[in-house]
């Protein structure tokens, strides 16, 4: 069995979700978001969202909601998304 890992859900579309990887590693690129409020967001250790590491998953593989981004972290995520990531679909 594979290890369960936290993710940030960015988009939900029918049976699929677009997610960003969450890691305990330090930020290493401008597209990485260190979560200032990681503890109140349901994470056990200081964490970084890698907005440059996106994946598309089936909703059926999601296990449970750990938490929700704080307003401040959500604003910072949106800023990084629009200024650094700018995906083309």
Give, region by region, the residue ranges found by the protein language model.
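Compact nucleic-acid interaction/catalytic patches
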Residues: 1-4, 8-39
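C-terminal terminal-subdomain/extension
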Residues: 40-89
């Amino acid at each position: 069995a594979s290890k369960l890992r936290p993710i940030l859900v960015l988009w939900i579309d029918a049976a699929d979700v677009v997610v960003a990887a969450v890691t305990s590693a330090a930020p290493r690129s401008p597209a990485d978001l260190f979560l200032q409020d990681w503890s109140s967001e349901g994470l056990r250790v200081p964490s970084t969202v890698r907005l440059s590491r996106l994946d598309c998953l089936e909703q059926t593989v999601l296990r449970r909601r750990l938490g929700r981004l704080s307003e401040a972290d959500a604003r910072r995520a949106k800023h990084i998304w629009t200024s650094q990531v700018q995906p083309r679909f």
